[in-house]
């Protein structure tokens, strides 16, 4: 019998200690040929709870063997299961994400039910969407964080006066369309991010469950194929690139990254009804590569702009919903400004 020995070295840079510990565990199981956790499920929700208190309760359960990574993450080994618990904090709620490995489907479902029982009265049932935010670490490695977001942004037609149809009608048309690409173009403060959030929230309504999106605003994440591969092979409904000026410029000006989007927009992404949304501060339509916004690939290139005084007064009146808007309107007039950003108006009214 001939035996072959293979020697090698593996370099592993650690950004997330919980992932590192899990990978060690999985490697050990694989090398020892143990079939310990053949079933995997995940559980995610948002709730108005104290995240640390929830993880404390899980860690102190006598049936669990916990390894507390930090205040927002926990690894648990219990009878026949391995659980990675993570959370992130928002102002009024927290997002929770559980990766669960078990011996059987029944075991995993019981664990999910037990976790949900602890937070049942505080789970948020309003429409939400999930952002899978991608970024590069200081070690130049791509990482991502999942964040559950409430789809509760105030979106009024008065904020976008150039739409020929209502905003909801426009968004619904985009979601139902075959075209994958939408470009939102305009100066800072004109409501591009708010509109993107409204689109994702509307996707959730169409699905009957939380929509999800790969999100990045980091130029460096677009310089390799990794984030594109993650989107193509993932389950997210949309790919959102904010501040995408560098991505949209003509290829004749040295833009070497756009071809990846052109390829996926016409391929599997379109056939699956998934979407690609760009926001950009580029001032002119001529600043964007024609191939990206051609009919059949791009649903629309939407220009959003600052509001003039009359439009700003109309928006203030609509935002206040019948309340006395006199003081706010007088403030707009006294400012001496000819144009107003949505950001300034929403901030003044605290929306």
Describe the predicted segments one by one:
Residues 219-247, 258-268:
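Conserved alpha-helical scaffold flanking the Walker A/P-loop in AAA+ ATPase domains
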Residues 163-165, 200, 204-235, 254-255:
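Short glycine-rich substrate-engagement loop in P-loop NTPases that contacts/grips substrate
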Residues 90-144:
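Interdomain "pre-motor" coupling segment immediately N-terminal to P-loop NTPase/helicase cores
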Residues 177-196:
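Walker A/P-loop nucleotide-binding motif
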Residues 1-83:
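Short Lys/Arg-enriched alpha/beta "domain-start" segment
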Residues 147-173:
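N-terminal pre-Walker A segment at the start of P-loop NTPase domains
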Residues 245-279, 283-294:
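Conserved catalytic/switch belt of AAA+ P-loop NTPases
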Residues 60, 84-87, 291, 297-351:
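C-terminal alpha-helical "lid" subdomain
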């Amino acid at each position: 019998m001939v035996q072959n020995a293979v020697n090698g070295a593996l370099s592993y840079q650690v950004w997330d200690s919980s992932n590192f510990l899990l990978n060690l565990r999985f490697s050990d199981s694989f090398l020892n040929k143990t079939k310990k956790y053949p079933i995997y499920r995940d559980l995610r929700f948002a709730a108005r709870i104290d995240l640390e208190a929830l993880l404390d309760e899980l860690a102190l359960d006598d049936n669990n063997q916990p390894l507390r990574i930090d205040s927002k993450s926990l690894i648990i080994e219990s009878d026949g299961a391995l659980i990675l618990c993570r959370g992130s904090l928002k102002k009024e709620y927290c997002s929770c994400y559980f990766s669960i490995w078990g011996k059987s489907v029944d075991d995993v479902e019981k664990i999910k039910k037990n976790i949900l029982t602890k937070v049942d009265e505080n789970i948020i049932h309003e429409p939400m969407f999930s952002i899978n935010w991608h970024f590069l670490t200081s070690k130049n490695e791509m990482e991502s964080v999942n964040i559950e977001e409430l789809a509760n942004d105030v979106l009024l037609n008065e904020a976008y006066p150039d739409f020929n149809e209502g905003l909801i009608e426009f968004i619904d048309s985009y979601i139902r369309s075959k075209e994958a690409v939408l470009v939102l173009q305009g100066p800072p403060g004109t409501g591009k991010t708010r509109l993107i959030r409204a689109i994702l929230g509307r996707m959730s309504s169409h699905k009957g469950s939380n929509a999800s999106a790969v999100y990045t605003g980091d130029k460096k994440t677009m310089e390799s194929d990794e984030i594109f591969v993650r989107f193509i092979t993932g389950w997210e409904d949309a790919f959102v690139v904010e501040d995408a000026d560098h991505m949209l410029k003509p290829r004749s000006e040295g833009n070497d990254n756009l071809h990846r989007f052109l390829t996926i927009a016409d391929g599997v992404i379109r056939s699956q009804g998934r979407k690609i949304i760009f926001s950009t501060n580029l001032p002119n339509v001529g600043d964007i590569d024609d191939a990206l916004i051609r009919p059949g690939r791009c649903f629309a290139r939407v220009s959003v702009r600052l509001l003039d005084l009359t439009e700003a007064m109309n928006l203030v009146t609509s935002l206040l919903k019948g309340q006395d808007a006199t003081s706010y309107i007088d403030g707009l007039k006294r400012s001496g400004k000819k144009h107003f950003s949505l950001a300034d108006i929403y901030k003044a009214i605290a929306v």
